[in-house]
Structures are given as C-alpha cells and as structure tokens.
Amino acid sequence: MMKSFFLAVTILALTLPFLVAQEQIQEQPTGCEKDERFFNDKIVKYIPIQYALSRYPSYGLNYYQHRPVALINNQFLPYPYYVKPGAVRSPAQILQWQVLPNTVPAKFCQAQPTTMARHPHPRLSFMAIPPKKNQDKTDIPSINTIATAESTITPTTEAIVDTVATQEAFSEVIESAPEAKTDQVTSTVV
C-alpha cells in the first residue's frame, strides 16, 4: 500500500514541473519578465519529490538496483531472468557464484558486461558413493547380518537312559539285562 502511494507521488512529482511549464506557456501573461522567472525558479525548487527523498531516504529512486541474474539458455527467452534474493538460507542451500560472460548481446556503443550465474557445488556428505567392485574376484552372495530374525523357542524331548547296576547283580550270574531308568527332560533350543 505504501509503496504504491510513494510510486504515485513520485510519478506526480516528476510530471508536475512539465505540466506547470506547459500551462505558463499557454497563458503568456503580460507581466514583468524578471518576476515570472523568479516565480518559476521557486516552483522548480520546491517540488515534492525532493521533500520525499530527504524525508524518506529508503524510498529513494533507484533505477539501477543490483539484482542477481540467472542465465537461462533458452531460444524463446532472450532476456536474463532476475532472481529474487532469499532472506534466510541454510548452509546447505548457500551456492557459489561464478563470473560468466553475458549472453545478451549489447549494443555496439556499450561494453560487454559480465553477469553472475549460480552453480551449485554439493557437499560430499550429501552424495552416495557406491563401493568399488573388484573384477578379479567372483561374486560372493551377501548375507544380511543386520537383519534380525525372531527366534522361536522349540521344546525338544530327549530320553536320557541311566543304567543302574545294583550290588546284587554282581553277586549273581549276569543273565538278566540291567534295569533301565528313563527320565523326561525338556530343553529349549534357540
């Protein structure tokens, strides 16, 4: 809102002296020449644009603002594209600037200016580097050692046989088989 107001005031201030001069030429008063010239100097001296520029220096007329130029090599876009500068950037987004020759043809009386174009240089931390492959070795299937498989506990039943020979068996003739005692033992195998 304020910028459009100051733009309107600036345009009015620039055109006001021409309008006043045109009206004075059309009127052609029959007064003294010295008084008329003194009156015109007063009008030109106190134009509002000078008051606005002295009062608000940040809104001064700057027709040659420095704007970064991004070159676009497009046959349908003969003019450079002006980039709006960003206010806040992270360190990863800060780009390097490189001086390149201007691709826009200059007129024969002007020197060829140089423009600035951005070229990103990514950091190594953002790049994925593939591992080197040896051509001499045969391919070994890779086993994923990081993946964890949930182990299921399977109970197993084993028969443990204890042979117990009693003292009576030693005194007798060994004709019968020794007594066999079986116990159920459960163990967890992972």
Curated annotation (Swiss-Prot):
Signal peptide (UniProt feature, chain positions): 1-21
GO cellular component: extracellular space
Pfam family, one: Casein_kappa
Record key words, sorted: Glycoprotein, Milk protein, Phosphoprotein, Secreted, Signal
Modification type Phosphothreonine: residues: 166
Similarity comment: Belongs to the kappa-casein family.
Full protein name: Kappa-casein
UniProt source species: Cervus nippon (Sika deer)
